[in-house]
Amino acid sequence: MSNFLGSHAINMDAKGRLAIPTKVREELAQLCGGRIVLTANADEEKCLLLYPEPEWEVLRPKIEALPNMNKAAKRLQRLILGNAALMELDASGRILVPQTLRNHANLEKRLMLVGLGKKYELWSEESWNAYLDASAADEEMPPEMEALSL
């Protein structure tokens, strides 16, 4: 089971290559032999989703099973499945982010890799900081969170 936590500031070169931080690389090597899937996030937050291959193989059939006559479901399928790129970390722990995904998330040199338990999100540093600075006052809290104590 994945237990990805924490935020990591990383850099991407002009060719779209980025080095996965050592701690993350070691987790991915142990969990999935460094085989990952990188895809677009389907909501308004312009970031990418990075799944270890075993987690992706659990999620993918659920997305494929959505009713494709439903416009929202079809959009989700197109964004997530249509942008999915299976890749493997190279010997230096790097991946090459496809140009289409870089464009989707407005990725340039400075990035943030954010752990969310079973997956990572890959953000431009600028978008991540803007997200953190934004007010959550307009967001509706789900009932499940109202009883949560931190």
Swiss-Prot record:
Residues 7-55, 84-127 form the SpoVT-AbrB domain. It is found in: Cytoplasm, Nucleoid. GO terms for cellular component: cytoplasm; nucleoid. One of its GO terms (biological process) is negative regulation of DNA-templated transcription initiation. GO terms for molecular function: DNA-binding transcription factor activity; transcription cis-regulatory region binding. InterPro entries: MraZ, MraZ_C, MraZ_dom, MraZ_N, MraZ_sf, SpoVT-AbrB_dom, SpoVT-AbrB_sf. Coiled coil: none annotated. Keywords: Cytoplasm, DNA-binding, Repeat, Transcription, Transcription regulation. The keyword Membrane does not apply. PROSITE patterns: SPOVT_ABRB. It holds the Pfam family MraZ. Its main location: cytoplasm. Belongs to the MraZ family. HAMAP family: MraZ (MF_01008). PANTHER family: TRANSCRIPTIONAL REGULATOR MRAZ. Forms oligomers. NCBIfam families: division/cell wall cluster transcriptional repressor MraZ. This is Transcriptional regulator MraZ. The gene is mraZ.
